[in-house]
Each structure stands twice: as structure tokens, then as C-alpha cells.
Swiss-Prot record:
This is V-type proton ATPase subunit E. It holds the Pfam family vATP-synt_E. GO terms for biological process: proton motive force-driven plasma membrane ATP synthesis. The lineage of its organism: Bacteria, Bacillati, Bacillota, Clostridia, Halanaerobiales. Belongs to the V-ATPase E subunit family. The gene is atpE.
Amino acid sequence: MDVSKKISVIKKEIINEALDKKEQIISREKDKWEKEYEDFKQKLDNKEKEIIELYRQEARMKKEQIVSRAVLKKKTEKRQKMDEYLHQILKELEEKLHEYRNDTGYRDFLKRLVKDSLNVMESSHVIIKLNSHDLKIFNEIQDELRNEIDNIEIEVANNPLNISGGVIVEDRDGKEIVENTFETCLEEVKEDIAVELHSKVL
């Protein structure tokens, strides 16, 4: 083989080798680029999902907050309504008790309150406290009470109490006290009324 042919063959081999290397490089770069593209695309998809999920969570939280505020507002309104009803009922009861003081049966009612109070007292010397209205009635019934109650010395406080009605009985030391007033009466029924209103209003 002459020199020119030999050179031509070598040249061809070099070109073919270069082309092969070029194809290999291109193929590797292509694979690398495709992998990078797929990775980028996956990251983009993940980011998009994160953003969508974040918006969903925020939307859910806002919805829950709105619902919670609405429920709280409704409960507050119902609670206010119940308090209004309770206040109105107690006021009406107080007015009726006040009117009852002028009823013919109030004399016996007051006498019974005093007797009930004395029956739970352990002291043999008690002080009876009343308002000015009931004090006048008590002066009319105290002799009857003294005859009906044994072994108890009854003393009547001269200074009238600032109460709606009823009686407060205490021993001389003020350690034992029994309150049978309109106020304590209303306080006792207040809880029962509130429970009943709660079941109907809330």
C-alpha cells in the first residue's frame, strides 16, 4: 500500500473514531440532559403539589376559622338570650314575692320560715333579723312562736335588714347563721331555671 492510501485509511479511522466519540459524548450529554430535565420536572411537580397543598391547608384553616367563629357567635347569642330570659324570670319572681308580702297568707308563710330556720339551729339563744315590713308582722306572731318552739330563747334585732323579705336567724356569736330570705330562695331556684333554659335555648 502506497503512502497516500495509508494516510487515507488512517485519516478515515481517525474520523470514524472521532465520530464515534462524538456520538458517545452526545449520547452521554443527551442522557445527562434528559435526567436533569426529568429531575427538574419532578422537582417542579413536587413544588407545584406543595403549593397546591399549602393553599388547600390555608383554605381549610380559613374555612374552619369561619365555621368556628360562626359557631361561637351563635353560642354567644344563645347564651345572651338565655341570660336575658333568666334575668326576666327572676325579676318576675322577685316582683311576685314582693306582692306576696301583702297577701293574707304571708303571715303564716313568714311564721313557717322562722320555724324552719329555728328547727335547724343548735343554739338555745337566737337572734331574729327581718326587714321593717316583716318585723311588724313578726311582732304579731312572736308570742305564738314562743309557745310552739321549746327551749329556744328568741331575741329580735331592732335594726331592720335591707332584704326583700324572709328571715335571717343566727346565734349570739354569729357563728351559726340560717338565711331564709327571698334572695336565698331566688338563688336556690336560679340554678334549676338556668338548667331548664339551657336545655330549651342552647
